[in-house]
């Protein structure tokens, strides 16, 4: 039998780990500069927690049955778990709370092949207790994150879940799910099959995307309700704040997979020569925390998640990521069995020096001839060999290439 990971899972080997840690560390440094603090939530949660009151479909969750706990699941995203943690564990916290995470998620897509990837790694933020001004902070933080990675080409697609949902409410209730699904899939053909009096309004909603000024102009021509105009005004203010800091498309047909968003939603997309790649997504969810509170009390929230695998693929061709594993600077070799304890002590001394935080020291674990030891050190690109006598005295040798 050949032992392999189960379908949908994969091993991540040391060089790829180092490359992804490079990405994570730069993102975390950016989060720290913006005063975000790390939170860790369980990989395994109760299924009702993960479903977020019906906003997340159960078929996307890898599920387990436990005799005592009932239905459990592996988290398909982090926002619901963090919302639950904020309500149940942070009752006395002072808001706003700025939180970030770096974690794996597990997600099934309906109709996906069994061999399709089901484990992913995400790094993201949640800003809890922030009003509309938090929208601007999150978009500017997103920009800072991507700049910290030296990402070559990217743009943001910005939507407004509350406004899109409100515009959909003009259609007959029984047709709203069909129209919503068609718009989410950009399925113009499905919309042309609607009754004649609904066809053009649905197509108009689908076409509310493009250059922001143009979309806002088209919105101004619609007969909007006061609350809809208020949302449009907020969008204008947000777009003025962002300005031309990064390329942005306004798209009111943007509908996210998870249905807990109530305000702005956005995708960040890499726009390379070969293909477009979704790097992350986010949005505002002002009612989510109420679903976990016994009294239904809520706090506004907004956040985003960046997909580590996709960032990794986009950054690989740039040459920024580590191209090889760090090598040891020292190889410590006891010259005979009586020198083993002294060799370990010498290695410990090297590692304990104040300036040795990044120093890599390894012990020779096999009894090799001096020439075989030197060849090993050359192959591993080790800088120095320390030959240790029983009394602890070292003979230092620089490894010649």
Curated annotation (Swiss-Prot):
The UniProt subunit note reads as follows: Heteromultimer composed of HisG and HisZ subunits.
Please give the family membership noted in the entry: Belongs to the class-II aminoacyl-tRNA synthetase family. HisZ subfamily.
Chief localization class? Answer: cytoplasm
Pfam families to which the protein is assigned, alphabetical: tRNA-synt_His
Q: Gene symbol?
A: hisZ
Name the CDD domains for this protein: HisRS-like_core
Biological process terms in GO annotation: histidyl-tRNA aminoacylation; L-histidine biosynthetic process
Q: Which key words tag this protein in UniProt?
A: Amino-acid biosynthesis, Cytoplasm, Histidine biosynthesis
Provide GO CC annotations from the record: cytoplasm
Q: What does this protein do?
A: Required for the first step of histidine biosynthesis. May allow the feedback regulation of ATP phosphoribosyltransferase activity by histidine.
Which species is this UniProt entry from? Cyanothece sp. (strain PCC 7425 / ATCC 29141)
Functional pathway: Amino-acid biosynthesis; L-histidine biosynthesis; L-histidine from 5-phospho-alpha-D-ribose 1-diphosphate: step 1/9
Q: Which protein is depicted?
A: ATP phosphoribosyltransferase regulatory subunit
Protein location: Cytoplasm
């Amino acid at each position: 039998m050949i032992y392999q990971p189960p379908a949908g899972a994969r091993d991540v080997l040391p060089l790829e780990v180092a490359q992804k840690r490079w990405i994570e560390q730069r993102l975390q440094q950016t989060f720290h500069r913006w005063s975000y603090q790390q939170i860790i939530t369980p990989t395994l949660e109760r299924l009702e927690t993960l479903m977020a009151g019906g906003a997340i479909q159960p078929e996307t969750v890898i599920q387990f049955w436990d005799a005592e706990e009932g239905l459990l699941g592996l988290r398909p995203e982090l926002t619901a778990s963090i919302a639950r943690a904020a309500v149940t564990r942070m009752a006395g916290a002072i808001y706003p709370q700025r939180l970030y995470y770096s974690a794996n998620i597990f997600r099934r897509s309906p109709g996906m092949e069994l061999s399709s990837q089901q484990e992913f790694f995400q790094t993201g933020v949640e800003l809890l207790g922030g009003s509309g001004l938090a929208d601007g902070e999150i978009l500017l933080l997103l920009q800072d994150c991507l700049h910290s990675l030296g990402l070559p080409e990217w743009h943001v697609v910005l939507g407004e879940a509350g406004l899109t949902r409100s515009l959909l409410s003009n259609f007959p209730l029984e047709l709203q799910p069909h129209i919503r699904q068609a718009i989410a899939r950009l399925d113009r053909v499905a919309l042309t099959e609607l009754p004649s009096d609904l066809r053009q309004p649905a197509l108009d909603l689908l076409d509310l995307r493009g250059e922001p000024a143009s979309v806002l102009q088209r919105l101004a021509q619609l007969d909007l309700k006061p609350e809809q105009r208020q949302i449009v005004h907020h969008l204008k203010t947000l777009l003025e704040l962002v300005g031309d800091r990064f390329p942005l498309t306004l798209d009111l047909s943007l509908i996210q997979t998870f249905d807990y968003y109530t305000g702005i939603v956005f995708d960040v997309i890499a726009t390379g020569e070969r293909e477009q790649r979704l790097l992350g997504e986010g949005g505002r969810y002002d009612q989510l925390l109420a679903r976990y509170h016994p009294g239904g009390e809520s706090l506004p929230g907004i956040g985003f998640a960046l997909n580590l695998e996709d960032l990794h693929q986009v950054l690989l061709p740039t040459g920024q990521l580590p191209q090889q594993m760090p090598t040891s600077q020292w190889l410590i070799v006891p010259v005979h069995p009586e020198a083993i304890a002294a060799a370990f002590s010498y290695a410990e001394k090297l590692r304990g020096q104040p300036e040795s935080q990044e120093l890599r020291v390894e012990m020779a674990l096999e009894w090799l001839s001096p020439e075989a030891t030197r060849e090993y050190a050359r192959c591993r690109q080790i800088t120095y060999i320390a030959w240790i006598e029983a009394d602890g005295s070292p003979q230092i040798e620089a490894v010649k290439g």
